[in-house]
């Protein structure tokens, strides 16, 4: 028996009404056919995301390897079952295909990766709102969402999932253009933020992530600094915990060892003596990287690329070989271009 969209939405609403937002029954129907082995902490995290209907979102901050993508998939499946299908996933560009495969293969949720080429094709075809697609989840990169912020802001999203959300932790700084642009574009939308590292260097990063979801939680930046400047006081720390409890959920690896058999790894120390040729390669590359005039590396990226090259050099000769080949090709290309310019100048 097939249901119309209206009937399906009505039945989903009835099921939701009968089940409390923090009950397992709320998710049971939505993930009945999912190809995943669920762990208790994943179900708990998904239910947490539903717990407060007045909340503007949630921050799921489980440690690395505990399945935050699965937790998000549970939330997406329930929203899909409720016919709330205007869903956007913002993720680093290199993770777009991974999200596409996970949602397709494990939760049978249709997805579309939206990038420049299909976006422009949609515009040429007369679809002037490429983000507003029916019955498919839209996946895009941070940069693309930032570039198309006006489209993102004008789309009535039911849910926005933001992966690797620690990229937004400095949103309180005006210099973080991407984070501030996305915050403004998504200010009235329900958001689900995923990150394993909600706090790295400063408590202000936690303020940034929470304010991205709901600015009312901590107030403005100056109020936050004044209230939580001294976490050594038990009372202040307790207040911070209470403020975070309704919006942030975190599970640690040590809390799930009862049902997840993590691989036990042992570090072994081995002595390594480089050969004479390897020593010479190291010295030559180091000398090259110390040059004042280094044409192969862009001036604005020199420090970062030097660090990367030194890591490759410390790894193995095979690791650095590919990078050195690329640098050589880049220099040859510059020389050919320069020769062409000089040839044209002579003719003129």
Residue ranges and their predicted role:
Residues 54-58, 85, 136, 190:
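Pre-Walker A (Motif I) flank of P-loop NTPase domains
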Residues 92, 195, 275:
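Conserved phosphate-coupling serine/threonine residues in phosphotransfer and NTP-handling enzymes
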Residues 55-74:
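Walker A/P-loop
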Residues 73, 103-106, 202-213, 282-283:
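PAPS/PAP-binding and catalytic site of the sulfotransferase fold
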Residues 1-47, 69-70, 80-178, 223-235:
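SF2 helicase/translocase NTPase motor core
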Residues 49, 63, 75-79, 99, ...:
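Hydrophobic residues on the short alpha-helix immediately C-terminal to a glycine-rich phosphate/catalytic loop
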Residues 63-64, 164-168, 196-198:
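Conserved Walker B
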Residues 128, 134, 138-157, 173-188, ...:
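Inter-lobe coupling linker of SF2 helicases/translocases
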